[in-house]
Amino acid sequence: MAQWACPLWQGLDQIDIALQQAQARWPALGSDTRHAITMSGEMVDAFEHREEGVQRIADRLAQVLRGEVRLYGGDLGWIAPADAARCWTQIASANWLATAHHAATVFRDGLLVDIGSTTTDLIVLANGRVQTASRSDHERLASGELVYHGVVRTPLCALARHVAFRGPPVNVMNEWFATTADVYRMTGELDPAHDQQPSADARSKDRTATRQRPARMIGLDARDAEDDEWLALAKAWRQAQIEEIAASLTRMMATRCGITSAGTIVTAGCGAFLVPDLAARVPALTGWPLRSYGCDVARIAATDDGAADASKADWAQVCAPSVAVASLYAQEPC
C-alpha cells in the first residue's frame, strides 16, 4: 500500500505523475493487472462540473492504466470506464461508501468514523448494511454524515471564531495562515508519512515554522510566546475541531441511527487518533468498543501468529477506500 499527493486542481497531468510513481513502486504491473478505482477528485475546480470530472478522470485512467479497469459505483456495482458518463452520479465521491460497505461485512452494527486529511465521514452500519439513503456529498452534508474537517488540509479559521490563549478567548483571523496539519504536528499526533500537503505559506514544516503559522491566526509571531503556550494553543484548536465533529455526530445519531443496542465504532483515516476523544463527547456512543479498519476489517498483512503487521495495518487504516475497493472487487468482481 502507498499513497501519493495528487493536486488535481492543477490539471489532469497530476494523475499521470501519481501513476508514474505507482508504476515505479510496482514495476510488475502489466496487462494482467486488475484495477479497482474509486474517486473524489471530480469536485476540483479544474472541471466545469462533477459530471465532466468523473468522465475525464475515468478516461485518463483508462488511457494510462494497463489491464482491466473498473470504477466503484456503489449500489450499481462495478462500472467500465466507457459507461462512466452514464453512471457518473454513482461514481462521484463514492470512496466513503466503499469503506462503509466493507466495514459492514465485518461489523453488522456500528459506526464508521473516517477522519482523513480533509473530511470526516460518519456512517451508521445496521444489520450488515450501510444505514443511510444519502449518496452525494450534498446529501451527506445536509444529513451531517459528511463533515468538512480533516487533520491536514483544513484551515484553522474554519474550526472556530475564537480560541483560548493565555486565558480568555481571542478572536481568530479569517485568513488561510495555518492548517490543522500545524496543530497535529505540534501535538505530535500526525504521522509525517501522512503530512503530504504543502503548508499554508509553502514554507518549512520544522518546529519554528509550524508555530509561526498558528501564531499568525491570533495576530502574533512564534517568538511572542513560550513552547508550552504554543502547545496549549494547539490543544485548544484540537478541542475546537473535536467539538465541531461531535456536534454533527450527536445530531446524526439522534435522527439517523438504526441501531437499537450498542454497536462497534470502526475507526479509519490518518486522523483516527481523534476518535477516542470524539466518541467520549457523544453520550449515544457510551460503551461502544473501538476497532480499527486496518486491523479488524482489512485483516491484511497478518504475521505467522495471526497478528496484524502494525506498519501495513496503519497504511490500510489510512488508505481505507483503496483497500476497500480492492477487497470488495476480489470478493465480487464484475
Predicted region positions:
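Glycine-rich anion/phosphate-binding loop at the beta-strand->alpha-helix junction
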Residues: 118-122
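Nucleotide/phosphate-binding catalytic cleft detector across ATP-hydrolyzing
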Residues: 2-113, 123-334
